[in-house]
């Protein structure tokens, strides 16, 4: 009997030890979170998250143009390392349709507008686009008062913008002008022809747009006002177009269905959506967020009208990309 009890006691100790090792391993496995995103300059949020939770945030930036193919290729190969994924809403919805995004709804979502949650895809901001310019080179009286002013010949060879044949966000923004700003398609097309005639410098995405404006190589661009914050003290300002909105694609995020660190992923998403993190995102990164009462520290932005533009289908993006390629004579 004593021998049997000794065997039982040894077995119990082994089981408990194994359980402790498994628990410690699980804890170790949740000490980091991988974040794939197209948003830039979010290091302050990553650092604040790590300081608040002890979980290391690993940020991988992927351009919008390569986002869908990169994430889905990794997902299909069983090599997706992302726990949390952030991208423009249309990209997240396509990933959701392919089974990449889970149904997790953060408790922080309750503070957002009802329309900002789409079955596990959480909208938290708008990738707002406008006209930014070099305030040392552009006289106050020359700053555009309407989007239409960008077609004025005085801006010839002085504009920079993302390639309208290939940059999906710019394609969507130009269509947004047609649907929200111009009175007719004819007026909109005249604007496009005038803009193209001004021979804008075309770059791959919004990321490279502020540099030539800052340096004085160009004076104005179709870009993101957030760069006024992230590029400070560069001499950048934004054109306060009269009775016309700033527009952009909704920024969205979700948790991967194959997240290597699912619990850490939930903590990260909860933290990201908190008012504290959104305030930091606005203040340090210049983002326009959907948290009520929180605005980026850009003069006049608290009074700006900022609206989301509709999602374009893949076919629409391809069709309009080809159309803009012709209008802008892109080789």
Residue ranges and their predicted role:
Residues 32-44, 62-66, 72, 80-217:
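Extracytoplasmic ligand-binding site segments that recognize negatively charged/polar headgroups
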Residues 297-331:
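Extracellular/periplasmic bilobal clamshell ligand-binding domains
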Residues 130-137, 175-178, 249-261, 280-284:
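A bilobed periplasmic-binding-protein/Venus flytrap-type ligand-binding module shared by bacterial periplasmic
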Residues 45, 187, 191, 260-272, ...:
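Short amphipathic alpha-helical coupling segments at ligand-binding clamshell hinges
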Residues 44-58:
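Short alpha-helix C-terminal cap/hinge motif
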Residues 127, 157-165, 191-196, 202-203, 233-259, 272-294:
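Periplasmic-binding protein-like
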Residues 9-20:
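Bacterial N-terminal signal peptides
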């Amino acid at each position: 009997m004593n021998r049997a009890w000794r065997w039982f006691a040894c077995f119990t100790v082994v089981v408990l030890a194994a359980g402790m090792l498994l628990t410690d391993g699980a804890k170790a496995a949740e000490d980091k979170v991988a974040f794939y995103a197209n948003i830039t300059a979010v290091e302050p949020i990553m650092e604040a998250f790590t300081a608040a939770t002890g979980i290391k945030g690993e940020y991988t930036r992927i351009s919008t143009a390569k986002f869908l193919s990169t994430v889905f290729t990794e997902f299909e190969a069983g090599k997706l390392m992302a726990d949390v994924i952030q991208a423009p809403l249309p990209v997240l919805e396509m990933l959701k349709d392919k089974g990449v995004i889970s149904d997790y709804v953060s408790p922080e979502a309750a503070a957002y507008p009802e329309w900002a949650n789409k079955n596990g895809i959480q909208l938290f901001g708008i990738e707002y686009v406008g006209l930014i310019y070099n305030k040392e080179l552009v006289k106050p009286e020359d700053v555009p008062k309407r989007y239409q002013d960008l077609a004025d010949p005085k801006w010839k060879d002085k504009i920079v913008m993302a390639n309208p044949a290939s940059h999906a966000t710019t394609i969507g923004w130009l269509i947004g002008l047609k649907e929200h700003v111009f009175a007719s398609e004819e007026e909109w097309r005249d604007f496009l022809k005038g803009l193209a005639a001004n021979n804008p410098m075309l770059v791959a995405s919004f990321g490279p747009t502020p540099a030539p404006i800052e340096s004085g190589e160009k004076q104005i661009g179709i870009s993101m006002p957030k760069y006024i914050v992230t590029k400070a003290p560069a001499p950048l300002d934004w054109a306060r177009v009269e009775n016309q909105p700033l527009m952009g694609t909704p920024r969205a995020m979700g948790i991967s269905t194959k997240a290597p660190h699912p619990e850490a992923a939930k903590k990260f998403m909860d933290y990201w959506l908190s008012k504290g993190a959104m305030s930091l995102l606005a203040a340090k990164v210049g983002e326009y967020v959907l948290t009520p009462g929180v605005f980026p520290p850009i003069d006049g932005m608290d009074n700006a009208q900022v609206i989301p533009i509709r999602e374009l289908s893949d076919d629409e993006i391809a069709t309009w990309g080809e159309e803009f390629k012709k209008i802008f004579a892109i080789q």
